[in-house]
Amino acid sequence: MPTYHQILKNPRRKKMHTNNVKALEGCPQKKGVCVKLRIVKPKKPNSAQRKVAKLRLSTRRMIIAYIPGQGHNLQEYSSVLVSGGRAPDLPGVRYTLIKGKYDFSWKESFERKKKLSKYGYSTKKKF
């Protein structure tokens, strides 16, 4: 326990919290344009071919974002919506693209029946 005199000489400092999604500048999402599409291999214990996109945000910042799901229709100069959320086994990938917005369509290479609704995309009802 510090003494009163010690606290007078060296006041307590608040902890600084780092922001992992600095390119979004405090916004929940930002619009971006695809510059390059790539396939990247993950870190050591995992083995796959993950799809990522290099984007230019509306603030003219360049970032790398993960493309979720099976199959995509993105090309160079496609408009996309970016949110925070990293891919744990891909170094340097701290952002994720949102499906169903702008040029990034919701359709996947095969239909999922078990996947829950996300971003207001309703599941097919059985009669």
Curated annotation (Swiss-Prot):
Upper classification of the organism: Eukaryota, Amoebozoa, Discosea, Longamoebia, Centramoebida
Keywords: Mitochondrion, Ribonucleoprotein, Ribosomal protein
Pfam families per UniProt: Ribosom_S12_S23
Subcellular location: Mitochondrion
Database matches in CDD domains: Ribosomal_S12 (cd03368)
Gene: RPS12
Protein name: Small ribosomal subunit protein uS12m
GO BP term, example: translation
GO molecular function: structural constituent of ribosome
Superkingdom of origin organism: Eukaryota
Family the entry assigns: Belongs to the universal ribosomal protein uS12 family.
Cellular component aspect of the GO annotation: mitochondrion; small ribosomal subunit
The keyword Ribosomal protein is assigned to this record: yes
UniProt xrefs under PROSITE patterns: RIBOSOMAL_S12
